[in-house]
Amino acid sequence: MKKSDIKYIVIGNGSNILVSDEGFRGVVVELGDGFSDYEFLQDSQDNSDEVLVKASAGMKLTRLGNQLAANGIAGFEFATGIPGCIGGAVRMNAGAYGGEFKDILVSAKVIDDEGVIRELSADELELGYRTSIVAKSNMIVLEATLKLRKGEPDIIRNNISELAAKRRQKQPLEYPSAGSTFKRPEGYFAAKLIEDAGLKGCARGGAQVSEKHAGFVVNKGDATAKDVCELTDYIKSEVMEKFGVGLELEVVKVGF
């Protein structure tokens, strides 16, 4: 596709993207069942508490987290419940509740801009807040190696359940959204800035700033991508005017 100058995008769960109302004029590659497995690279029965796990890019985070919990593997609880896949989690250095992928990532196998398959260490991936070298390039993540640890299945499941309860309590899961809308500006919290600007409940068409959590723009039923863009542009303008802080989208726009 690159040689033929055909535009393309690779997605896993597609949970953190906003697609233009006109669609995407190119090829959409979904990493499906052929990229949704995992394996232990170390015997979890040996004397070491450390466990290395290799997971394919299309593996859903919640599915992997639940299977790891059943096997008594801890350290992945923070990611269990994030609506995404391994590939996207590496690309964005996904994180929640005090954990980030950079804390557990050893390396990732990628296809680079020249079509060469490479194994990049965590340092080479340049993981930062919701970004990586993958996000800054046209690299495609194929799989990731994670460093986790042994634990008690019941304790791990309990931790996962507690985090799931927090998500249900604080996040507007009752409405469709593309997840957290804005990245956290250094020294601030995007949701607090938006709320302090008086924008909770603010709407454009069917898109609305969640009244439950101002960090989410939700679809109240008939939102278009245009509605979402108009609303996020307005939010950025108001926050800049009131607080002098620039907000950057965490949601990835496609086809614009």
Please place each PLM-identified region on the residue numbering.
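Anion-binding (especially nucleotide phosphate/pyrophosphate-binding) glycine-rich loop
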Residues: M1-I86
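Phosphate/pyrophosphate- and phosphate-bearing ligand-binding catalytic cores of soluble enzymes
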Residues: N13, I17, I111-F256
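Gly/Ser/Thr-rich helix-start
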Residues: N13-S15, F24-V27, M59, I82-A89, ...
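Structural signature of FAD isoalloxazine-binding scaffolds in flavoprotein oxidoreductases
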Residues: L18-D37, R91-S121, K136-E143
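Short coil/turn segments at secondary-structure junctions
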Residues: N47-S48, M92, N219-K220
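Residue-level signal for beta-strand positions within conserved beta-sheet cores that form or flank
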Residues: V51, I104, V245-L247
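Hydrophobic, well-ordered secondary-structure segments
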Residues: L61, G65, A79, P83-G87, ...
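Short Pro/Gly-enriched beta-strand edge/turn motifs at strand-loop
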Residues: A89-M92, L127
